From Swiss-Prot:
Pfam families: SGL (PF08450). Binds 1 divalent metal cation per subunit. It is an enzyme of class 3 (hydrolase). SUPFAM superfamilies: Calcium-dependent phosphotriesterase (SSF63829). This is 6-deoxy-6-sulfogluconolactonase. It comes from Pseudomonas putida.
Amino acid sequence: MNETLKCVVRQPSVLGECPVWSVREQVLYWADILAGRLHRLDPRDGSVSTLQLPEELGCFGLREQGGFIVALRSGIYLLDAHGQLGERLAENPTGAEHSRFNDGRVDPWGRFWAGTLWQPRDRNGGQLLRVDAEHRAQVMAGDVMVSNGLAFSPDRAWAYHSDTPNHVLYRYPLDEDGQPGTRQLLREFARGSGGRPDGAAFDSAGCYWSAQFDGGRVLRLSPDGQVLDEIQLPTRWPTMVAFGGEDLRTLYITSSRENRSAEELADWPLSGCVFATRVNVPGCAEPLFAG
């Protein structure tokens, strides 16, 4: 076990996801998707505060103007810092009856991307939606069962995107305006106890840190998809990572306890908690939504 690994939030989420470090505030935000909650951790004193939203909260980004852009089950909305829901910018592209938003983030050009997962998970019905600063929405990709692992390389040359139940990691080349090209298969993960690719983030060296759901670890992958390092965790169900701290060398990791039996939770009691560990390579500051 990594000697610097700590549990920094012991109050568990049902499905903790989408950790986002605010450089401006020096705090960590994350979502409890199924509870519709947006949490905020101040690591200086360990305090946690929460905004309760009216629907499941798949993912979110921070805004230049303050507040958030949030992907709820029914669509993408603006949200102020006090939790007041504002304008709806886009509907769920795959329909709220059979899907919800899952993973997403703001790209280096200040646009918000959010992917959906198909319910039930019997087809590749998930899509990836982008909302720009003028609040125009466009479907950018599809043909996935669970849209996940979206991250943009620090040189702005690539977008990585995983499909968790299908055990695959893709990448898209990006042009100078951030428009994606043809999808490429970067890595197919072995089926078994090693886990499935969930949420992720890039470090400043261009390596991709991927939470391995049901595998109890985080992998650091080279730009061509080779495993360089791994961090073992006290839960089998990590969901996503984010770089934070003043030097962006603290790796925060969210996790899940959704649908776990009493026996599983007895074996893994910290499931749903937030963890942090120090790493050698800093991450990248999370961009802000320009709209």
